[in-house]
Amino acid sequence: QLKVAMDCLREVSDNLKNKNIPLHMFEGDYEELKNWIEINFPNSVIYMNHSTDIDYYRTKTNVFKRFYADQKRIKIFENFGIQTKNFNRDAWSFDWQKIMTKPILSEVKASAPWGLKDIKLNSFEEFSSKITLIDQMPESQIGGETKAFELMHSFLEERGNGYAFKMSSPVEAEFACSRLSTHLAFGSISLKTVYQSLLEAIPNSSFKKDLYSFKKRLHWHCHFIQKLETEPELEFSSMHPMCDKLRGDGDNEIIEKWIKGETGFPFLDACMQFLKKKGWINFRMRAMIMSFASYNLWQPWHKTSPL
């Protein structure tokens, strides 16, 4: 994840340089960031994307956002097609469609003069020189907008042929799936861009059925995120409360073998080894891996889900 994040930031830095804008990196938590902003830019407006985070980040970001919202100094952009307030099941599909069909902002063309005072922050180059990746994972995905658009176009034009069937295969999914999940998660391409490009591609496609299947997955992507947005307690509690006490504390030795892909079950172990090597595995196999840990190995999901 850190590697992909650095890939994305590197491309952002390069693109901003072309517009005469340097990318600076702040290091610290949200409280420290708020204090730094108020000292250096007390009248500034904050622009950020909404994200559905785990509890640790959600708590801190909510305090940060509330501070600036009270002063009407924050603009939050919708990242995915989810309801962030006024939750209404009946209106969900309508709201999703409304968000996904909004016009895509055009790229800023003009160079911006850099007239800010010395803000004493590291440039991206200075920041990245301090980052050391212990496990390079050479076969993992490359982050950044350029790669995201390459994947999207190759999927819509060629790789998506047979997607409806191949996406379930641990052998074929690596190439037949869009492989855009990483880029959607890190923001190197927007869901709105993917959806609108998909709508443009469908009429002239020779594999419409596969693209319609992909269209459903874009809805499901937000459907599952909506669950965590609406019920953040699902991070800690089972959806069905009666299941919370079914398992004990877990067996660390069994969990360790599961993580390493050394359970002795060939299919499961092969998937775990693939995941460790590539940093990605298709949705059906992710579901299988977690189901195996919960049902076959009878381990608590609270311990296996973060791993």
Name each model-derived stretch:
Residues 1-214, 225:
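Active-site "lid/cap" and pocket-lining segments within catalytic core domains
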Residues 176-307:
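Active-site-proximal binding-pocket segments
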